[in-house]
Amino acid sequence: MRQTLRLVGPDAAPQWRLMAGGTAVLLAEVVFRVLEPWPLKVTIDSLVAALGRHTGRAPDTVSSLVGLGLALLVIVAGRAVCNYLATVAFALVGSRTAASLRSRAFHHVQGLSQQFHARNRSADTVQRLIADVNRMQEVAVTAGLPMAANTLTLLVMVVVMVFLDPLLAMIVLVAVVAFMLASSGNSRRISAASLRSRKSEGNLANTAQEALGAIKVVQAYGLEPLLHERFTGANTVSLSEGVRSRRIAARLERSTDVIVGVATAVVMVGGGIRVLNGAMSPGDLVLFTTYLRTTMKPLRDMAKYTGRIARATASGERVADLMAVKPDIVSPADAIVLDRVHGMIHFDHVHAAYEGRPVLHGVNLTVVPGEHVALVGPSGSGKSTLVSLVVRALDPTSGTVSLDGHSLDELDLRFLRSQASVLHQEAVLLTGTIRENIRLGRPDASDEEVEAAARAAHAHEFITQMPGGYDTTVGERGGTLSGGQRQRIAIARALLRDSPIVILDEATTGLDPASTSAVLEAIDELVAGRTTLTVTHDPQAAMRADRVVWIQDGRIRLEGSPQDLMESSAEFRRWANSHLADSFALVGSGS
């Protein structure tokens, strides 16, 4: 619970005025609850006294009854108004706090390294951002507020009962202590079971996301029974843990019923004896039993709310665990923002590791402004790791990567990444229109600039042939478009961004020859005059570069212009000809 309270503290603090107002009316509601039985007590004592004097109906007694009835109406109305205001105030606090926490958590997750996202399933992270925060908000309003009101009511009622009759009040205190003892142990067990349940729900979400995200493969290979079995297994685990927590909560509620029943019976018998002995009036007994009933209701409610709050606490711990992850890569305190970026990139004795495994070993490489360098070599040799260093998706374990003479870890991270356009093998588009996806490169771009970028990327023709043109809505991750179309839209986005550095990571891999040719033409437009690093297994893409760097086992093995390497390196020539025997037969024979 303390961890959850620390988590929401920064988000709840700006709502202090609402919380103060809500607390004030909550206290007023408790006062009205304390006052509510008094008209009934006075009425009973007045009637007993009147009946003891005579059997007639005294006018003053009738007027007193009317006044007491009106007083009760005022008290009930006041309590209702205060309850309404407190509910609204704390509902606003809960909603605003949850929205702030969700936004803060999403911003935090976006700033975590790619290694974090590779290690953690995205569906579980989404579950923490949405479902767990929602549960915290719901329980805070529907259980936290009533429990706070009940706790205040319980404390005030116990104090009042001690003043009314200390002996009978001891019975109530014993009942409260018995409840606290029963609650403390059960709360821990409910929290533990709820935490396991939330983890199981996260696994359930992961299983569903993986199956639906790869539905083409699932259906093509007939994997539906296998994945259904996995989903059912995860669903069963989630169900059993949820039932376990609710069973413990139900046990606590029934134990509380027994405690309340015993306390009520003892007070009823003991109070009746004290009335017969003249130690208290009938009105006092009614007042005391009313307070007892009012006091026991919070105990029953606390038993009911304890389980819900324990489950919310488990959700809070999951969100807190997520927020406790420290970003691996951050801007320095005195970050530098360059007035102008020329695009000189220098790797000086760079070593790098991924997931603890060494990948690069002492790489030295300089890319001059406007130069196009292709990085080739076997898979897993460190090419993608090398270009990841340029935008600080990863930091070297030793050595320095610099831009225009400044070490990257001296530069403002947001500024650094704004200076590079990155195209990956899978061009991911966001749900929305084609125009909106291109405009992500520069949100303030006009429609004319968006169209000009699409023309330069050789995307305008196929876009205008679509029913909605630039306003055609693409599906999730651009699934309604072909790979080549998605890549050309991504290139248009990069052209609109107009950054001095371009990074192409397997941008043509997996495309058919026609799409590859169209994408390569668009890439030529993109890289012109820009510092470019291209990771590729495609000789067509490599031969368009100014320089080719062969990386193997994390080290640079070959380096030179494509033409020089074709002439001087049998290894490079074999690689090129084996990939494009027909296209490069003429080039190879000329070496």
Feature-to-residue mapping (PLM):
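An intracellular "coupling" helix at the cytosolic face of ABC transporter transmembrane type-1 domains
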Residues: 13-14, 114-118, 131-140, 144, ...
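Juxtamembrane helix-loop junctions of ABC transporter transmembrane domains
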Residues: 1, 24-25, 32-48, 52, ...
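Cytosolic ends of transmembrane helices, especially the final helix of ABC transmembrane type-1 domains
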Residues: 223, 247, 294-322
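ABC-type nucleotide-binding domain
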Residues: 338-591
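Hydrophobic alpha-helical segments in the permease module
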Residues: 72-79, 83, 176-182, 249-263, ...
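Transmembrane helix-loop-helix hairpins at lipid-water interfaces of multipass membrane proteins
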Residues: 19-81, 162-167, 278-282
